Amino acid sequence: MSSKTSIDLFKMARFTNLVIPVLTVVFFLGGYFLSFYLHFFTVFFLFLTIINFFYRHVQKTHALLRNFGIMGQARYMMESIGPELRQYFFASDTEERPFNREERSEVYRKAKGIDSASSFGSQKMFDATEIKIRHSMYPTAKDKLKPYSVTFGEERGIENKHMFTRPIAISAMSYGALGQNAVRSLARGAKAAGISMNTGEGGYPKYHLMEGCDLIFQLGTAKFGVRHEDGTLDDEKLRKVASEDAIKMIEIKLSQGAKPGKGGLLPKEKITDEISELRGVPKGADVISPTNHVECEDPTTTVQFIKRIQDVSQLPVGIKLCVGCLDEFRSLVVEMKALDIFPDYISVDGAEGGTGAAPKAFMDNYGMPLFPALHGVVTILKEEGVRDRLKVMAAGKLIGPGRQMVAYCLGADAIYSARGFMLTLGCIQALQCGNNTCPVGITTHDPDLQGGIVVADKAKRVENYVENMEHDFYQLLAATGKNSVQELSTSNLYIPSGTTLAEFIQPDAAFNKAG
């Protein structure tokens, strides 16, 4: 039945390919004999004829265009606007990835200072795939809650400790991945909100430093800004960076959630003269960082490298990693115990974390999701008796208060978010981060597109987002009946059997045990 009633597109294309040159001739004759103005149509159809001839007989790349001609181009045009059509007209509020419309809207509202209360009921799925937070029959009174604070470096007793006084920090985003207006907006907003910002692995943080916020300098595998020509660490360059008043901590990036086992990638389209100078890399080619630090060949050399950075910088030093194998992580912890050398914090990056550019094969298939990875890391630290020797941070799609509170229940001391703050700047999830064509000017170095970011306005939105996230944090904490995040545990979570976390938790521990 369908074969008889369906449209034969190939026949339509053949008919179209015949009609276009015929109409060209018809309008030419009409313009010659009837009215000169018909030659406007002659020019139009002659142009179509030439384009059609090129598609069908000259170009050899696209088989569809060789068979269907100009009519086949309609398919490519529809495909190119498909993401926009789905996002704005067809996808429901809870369908899109990595963040659906409901999740993005909550961030937008918090950034604009608009009440994010909803009506009628949740759009979440209350089934075996949703982790929920268990409330108490006896919520904690507001005046009984302990103000949030976490101090990095206190375990080692160093002089240059660093304290977070708000339950969120801006995760690693470099100048290069972001444009200068976006970096300055985030840094100015971080300063106003009193939170720290990670510089990312982009070398000397010129634009991060302009706004005076507390910074965490990230040392990537390429060591941009602090390297010798052979890619090894230049201690003097690192010492100079660490001496900047705004640099409060150093973070050694071992791996990243969106591309674990793969070095960072900055597409050549985004490498300006300035970025080339700041990173010490040539223009005209993609900048691909090594897969690992050349100094880190095994657990022993990795721990020794951590100690080296601590000695050179005289600052709190953490490591960032995406967990692949928990046994491998345990071997690293065992070596820390043996050498009595510990980082001041470990940042656990979930496989669902974001990036400006990464191979899709890595983005889709490698790394442990945040929650099981975080639980595994904290459990190993406890089993090895060293949980009190360092802090644990968590990152990976933590843009809303619910997932952040789950991370705290799983043992995190502090939370990182990157894409949450990008959304505060107006990110529309166009998925153009690596193409230098970001339509709102966040992840581009095109001066015209960057003009969309007004630093003063966006900095205020960053501040609003932090204020409203903190408000929700204390409300959710109070509902658990606890006084501080240090009292939270997995017993404060309902973890259904269908979640990736369930197999790592003891049976019934999250359901029957009193919170």
Model-flagged regions — what are they?
Residues 2-168, 172-196, 202-212, 217-229, ...:
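Conserved, well-structured core domains of diverse proteins
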Residues 206-208, 322-328, 391-401, 482-498:
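A glycine-rich phosphate-binding loop feature that marks nucleotide/adenosyl-phosphate handling sites
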Residues 227-253, 369, 379, 390, ...:
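Phosphate/diphosphate-binding loops
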Residues 217, 221-225, 268-297, 356-371, ...:
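Glycine-rich tight-turn/loop motif centered on a GG-T
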Residues 288-450:
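Glycine-rich phosphate/ribose-binding loops and adjacent secondary-structure elements
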Residues 180, 184, 193, 197, ...:
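Internal alpha/beta core interface subdomains
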Residues 244-267, 326, 331-344, 348:
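Carboxylate/His-rich catalytic cores and anion/metal-binding grooves
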Residues 428-490, 496:
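Active-site or pore-adjacent capping/gating segments
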